[in-house]
Amino acid sequence: LRDVELAPAASLGVMAEGEAVLKGLQSFHSLPCFNTYLRQSYYIDVFNKGATPLKWKTSVTNDWILVSKKSGETTTEERIEVSIDWAKVPAGERILGTLDIMSDRGEKETVYISVFNPTSPSLAEMDTLFVENNGYVAMDAASFHRKVENDDIKMIVIPNLGFENTAVQLGNPMAKAQRTAGR
């Protein structure tokens, strides 16, 4: 273990949700794609790499990009929630914008924002379907179409548990181990 000495002057640092590494190993900041069918928000962490307080402010390229904080002062870090005004964003499958974060010392970091807002299918048509988002599809386990069980292994739906408010348990966790080789 070793102590890290902070620089005496404030210095701007930015990390966007979904980034695997700090900038330096990656050449730009970008949030995951906003999807009209999911209407989610993402975050950006603004942090201070120095010992004195950091003053910062934000600027967006489009009025449909909404931020929870437009400016601030921090000695450690602050989180900005970013969302989309879906009534103002233009229709299209790859709408782009940027969010700039500037320090009072002249430092600037840009975060790229992309939006998936197709005209068709409508939000109402997609209401009960599973939607791909940023390269994956998340399905509620209890919404299975069919199940295959045997005498020893049953699927048990557990209400009021999990992200979608239902979960599925496979088998009895207290039962002896099953040998399924050769099936």
Model-identified regions with their sequence ranges:
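A short beta-strand micro-motif common to beta-rich folds, especially ectodomain repeats
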Residues: 44, 90-105, 113
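Surface-exposed binding patches on compact interaction domains or structured appendages
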Residues: 49-81
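Short, polar loop/linker segments at the starts of domains and inter-domain junctions
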Residues: 150-167
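C-terminal edge beta-strand
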Residues: 108-120
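Beta-sheet-dominated interaction scaffolds and their linkers
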Residues: 2-49, 89, 123-126
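Extracellular carbohydrate-recognition regions
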Residues: 119-153
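Extracellular/luminal low-complexity segments enriched in Ser/Thr/Pro
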Residues: 79-95
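Short beta-strands within extracellular/lumenal beta-sheet-rich domains
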Residues: 38-40, 166-183
